[in-house]
């Protein structure tokens, strides 16, 4: 709950945690909440992880589960969420993309260009493995005050951008999740 409240209340949230606590599940829950609480067409979710396999087989698998359990709009595929907006006159519009998962090339600064919506949520799963260039590309999506960023992972690499944003004064609201907070730890 603290993580969702942080995303609600802060533009940027960093969650540092141990292994095996369900980080991808937490990210998927936040994504489901974000899409469900905004008008289709006004919100867009961009997700990434260090590998394409992590994007599809881990994060988007969890997003699909969240979507399937809830009364959430649209449909979820292996790496996309599509939904039908309601037009001002009450008729359904044309189905549109409201979120996707991608693993761009590590040095592709244009990876997330062309994404425009009044509210954008950027999610990095396993953020410790994301290269600096993709952090810069994602930051370019934070152009308006209603955009949000959630980065979640294990800050194991002392040279990573994720380790830096977990430090005080980084501009991120940082939440630590201990192994002792997880039911997976016995």
PLM feature spans:
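Phosphate/NTP-binding elements of NTP-utilizing enzymes
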Residues: 1-186
């Amino acid at each position: 709950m603290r993580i969702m409240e942080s995303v609600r209340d802060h533009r940027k949230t960093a969650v540092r945690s141990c292994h095996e606590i369900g980080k991808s599940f937490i990210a998927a829950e936040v994504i489901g909440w974000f899409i469900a609480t905004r008008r289709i067409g006004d919100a867009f979710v961009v997700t990434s992880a260090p590998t394409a396999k992590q994007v599809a087989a881990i994060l988007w698998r969890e997003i699909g589960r969240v979507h399937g359990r809830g009364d959430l709009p649209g449909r979820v595929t292996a790496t996309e969420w599509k939904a039908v907006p309601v037009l001002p006159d009450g008729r359904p519009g044309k189905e549109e993309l409201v979120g996707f998962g991608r693993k761009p090339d590590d040095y592709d600064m244009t990876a997330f260009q062309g994404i425009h919506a009044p509210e954008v949520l950027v999610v990095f799963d396993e953020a410790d493995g994301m290269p600096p260039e993709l952090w810069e590309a994602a930051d370019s999506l934070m152009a308006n005050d209603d955009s949000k960023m959630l980065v979640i992972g294990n800050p194991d690499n002392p040279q990573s951008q994720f380790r830096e944003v977990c430090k005080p004064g980084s501009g991120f609201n940082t939440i630590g999740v201990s192994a002792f907070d997880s039911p997976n730890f016995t």
